[in-house]
Amino acid sequence: MGHRFLRGFLRVLLPPLPLRSPHLKLSLEPVAPSKRPRSHLMAPPRIGTHNGTFHCDEALACALLRLLPEYREAEIVRTRDPEKLAACDIVVDVGGEYDPQRHRYDHHQRSFTETMSSLSPGKPWQTKLSSAGLIYLHFGHKLLAQLLGTSEEDGMVGTLYDKMYENFVEEVDAVDNGISQWEEGEPRYLLTTTLSARVARLNPTWNQPNQDTEAGFKRAMDLVREEFLQRLDFYQNSWLPARTLVEEALAKRFQVDPSGEIIELEKGGCPWKEHLYQLELGLSPAGTIAFVIYTDQAGQWRVQCVPKEPHSFQSRLPLLEPWRGLRDEALDQISGIPGCIFVHASGFIGGHRTREGALSMARATLAQRPAPTPAPNPMVQ
């Protein structure tokens, strides 16, 4: 993990004063007095959730809460007994009520239809929230600020808050609420190794003599907490810094090639695609990028085609068809560019020993393309 992230995590271990989030539309009022006896008021707080078979959403909800200083030592009370739940400081995924003022975060009641968009106007996500999404919505900015070692007002917190929801929490919400990955048609493959599926497999099997779920639930919290922290670390220390590299590359694109359709990244291997699509929207003059060149770990050059969409295997402009699937001397001969290493069979990427050679591969493809038609930007709906 990066040093900044570790410093942030140390702040969780040595908690600062809690901060209120200015980002949330629903403010959290002080919690109603606990129904616990007065003699227990100094006891660790209690997080209530249901017992029996557990799922990814409440495991993640509890794990996220325990990353906050005020709940780090919290007791997890797994029960469906209303009296025991009433004595808890916060209740997730059980109880049949959503009342953030009293810290009740269930989503199973018929009346509950909330999404990130409905509770936080301006957010685009329309997936019905699970207990994980509810906890993330109400505590996420505060949690990320503490983990990242900064304030909630830091723009990085807002950026990573959105990124972590879209790429981590929303899937948990969707799976728990039974929302199909596809709106129409048959899925082309099965998702069997998702976070939710791995949590589900920690439950006892139907034919195990011991049906106790307590140990499995603790393992589930460890699993989702570790994965959440790893993802946040990646977005903070890899994904976010890559934006600066893409911005710089776009600013220099006409120095790389007069077409303005080839950019050169200072460092290869960075996650550039999503940043490119977003930054293209503000280009002046307007345009889209066809190729990205960069060095690989061996110091050789790659020329990669920009895909039509972030996760698409189709390129805006693939490398020339006669080159595809060829290597070394055979590729040199047919391309007329000495020093080639390879071109992938689909044409989405190629390799060359030199920067000039990689540029020549991109330029030759640009020169032989059909009459230009502006490539759509996937960020434009």
UniProtKB/Swiss-Prot annotation:
Per the entry, what this protein does is: 3'-5' RNA exonuclease which cleaves in situ on specific transcripts in both nucleus and mitochondrion. Involved in regulating spatially segregated organellar RNA processing, acts as a coordinator of nucleo-mitochondrial crosstalk. In nucleolus, processes pre-ribosomal RNA involved in ribosome assembly and alters cytoplasmic translation. In mitochondrial matrix, processes 3'-termini of the mito-ribosomal and messenger RNAs and controls translation of mitochondrial proteins.
Write out the entry's keywords from A to Z. Answer: Acetylation, Hydrolase, Mitochondrion, Nuclease, Nucleus, Phosphoprotein, Transit peptide
Q: Does the keyword Phosphoprotein apply?
A: yes
Question: What GO CC terms are in its UniProt record?
Answer: cytoplasm; mitochondrial matrix; mitochondrion; nucleolus; nucleoplasm; nucleus
- Taxonomy, superkingdom: Eukaryota
* Subcellular location, principal: nucleus
Name the Pfam families on file: MYG1_exonuc (PF03690)
The species this protein belongs to is Bos taurus (Bovine)
Q: Which residues carry this modification: N6-acetyllysine?
A: K267, K273
Tell me which residues form the transit peptide: 1-47
Record's subcellular location: Nucleus, Nucleoplasm; Mitochondrion matrix; Nucleus, Nucleolus
Look up keyword Cell inner membrane and say if it applies.
no
Positions of post-translational Phosphoserine modification: S120
Ranges annotated as spanning the membrane: none
Q: What family does the entry list?
A: Belongs to the MYG1 family.
What top-level class of enzyme does the UniProt entry assign?
Answer: hydrolase
Recorded protein name is: MYG1 exonuclease
User: MF terms per GO, please?
Assistant: nuclease activity
Q: What is its EC number?
A: 3.1.-.-
